[in-house]
Amino acid sequence: MEDTHLLTPYKMGQLNLAHRIVHAPVSRFRSYGSMPQPHNLLYYAQRATPGALLIAEASAVSYAALGRSKDDAANGPIHRQRPGPPGFLFGTNLTDYNSATDGVKATESGVNDRNNLSKWWFMSRLNESGNAGGAEESHYTLPSSLDAPGLWNQEQIEAWRPIVDAVHAKGALFFCQIWHNGRVFSTDNPVTPQVSYFGNTDDLAPAAPQRLETGEIVQIVEDFRVAARNAIKAGFDGVEIHAANGHLLHQFMKASVNDRTDEYGGSVENRCRITVDAMSAVAEEIGADRVGVRLSPFADHCREEGTDPEEVALHLIGVMNGLGVLYCHVIEPRCMREQHRGAPRAPQRPAPPAPVQKGVPRHVHCERRVRPGGRGQGGRRRLRRPGVVREIVPGQPRPAGEVQAEGGSERV
């Protein structure tokens, strides 16, 4: 490729990036029992290149953040009461897994072991007992937020460490996205700013969500603080606060979802309060120069229409600038109301801190986006092809269909 801005160095705060292609967080729900697994090490190490920035998949700030009920979250198990596959870890340091050789590469047998591990996991979801043998397709269940990784206890910190070390060994920088699910997943009692879910139930929320009390909101903010602290203990270079895609912080922003009449509802400032509090707490805990924030103000995920998305975004960007947050990760909307298409720009729009944009599927399109000085993120491309950065260098990226599937080391 001729001289491209995508491959030019970029200084982001105290971080020196070799190029402007960032590995976006992609939820995979393969961390059985919320414990990072051996295949996570291989997955991220494959995608790490010198001077690159990777952002790990959304990691829950608490057991309740997975979408569990308040009572269950208080003393709930870290994993479901079903047998785990051989090699999956519950409170065991990942370095004990004998298929990892030097923490970065794996032998051919090790790769196959990891692939078999993942295959076992998916097969175990085909029946109710959790046994891979004799699975019946009729009992298939979709990946669950319960299988998202977490960052709320010491065991998870220890499980993340070798994964972070593997990424650092490749010369890359590694952030972790921290997240609270809210009402999105199908669970017993998801939490929400509101009382009901549009007056009925559907496949997204089979039970009525539980309204959060003020004290519980304060605790959630504290959970974000602790998760950020734990991420640094695990070796991450920073965290990204997930305030997008219809999850809890995003739910508070949307007037169609947030019907509260207290200090967390009503005005734009009130609806953004929990997000602002979380940003402030995390910045205070680990330093604002280690904090990014993900927003999707125009997206209407999970029936969460917004009447004032631009006002919400501008308010939050102003707060980020005041705190000195490292970057703002804005997602290109794929779910949006028709009237928001081509929405006019605010005449005095404040510039977001170090803008990062996700949802730019082709490197030529991304090249146009990063010329003003931001970075482009690619999550889905890297999910399928860990070498996407190397492909751009010669200017001959493979077509989207040419990806490695069964058999190769990329299948994790």
Swiss-Prot record:
InterPro entries, sorted: Aldolase_TIM, OxRdtase_FMN_N, Oye-like
Any GO MF annotation of the entry: oxidoreductase activity
EC main group: oxidoreductase
Residues annotated for FMN binding in this entry: 25-27, 58, 177, 294, 379-380
Positions contributing to substrate binding: 242-245, 334
Region (Disordered): 339-412
This protein's name: Putative 12-oxophytodienoate reductase 9
Compositional bias segments (type: Basic residues): 360-387
Superkingdom of origin: Eukaryota
Cofactors: FMN
Keywords assigned: Fatty acid biosynthesis, Fatty acid metabolism, Flavoprotein, FMN, Lipid biosynthesis, Lipid metabolism, NADP, Oxidoreductase, Oxylipin biosynthesis
Enzyme Commission code: 1.3.1.-
Family affiliation: Belongs to the NADH:flavin oxidoreductase/NADH oxidase family.
GO biological process terms, semicolon-separated: fatty acid biosynthetic process; oxylipin biosynthetic process
Entry keyword Flavoprotein: yes
The organism of origin for this protein: Oryza sativa subsp. japonica (Rice)
Known role: Putative oxophytodienoate reductase that may be involved in the biosynthesis or metabolism of oxylipin signaling molecules.
Name of a matching Pfam family: Oxidored_FMN
Record carries keyword Lipid metabolism: yes
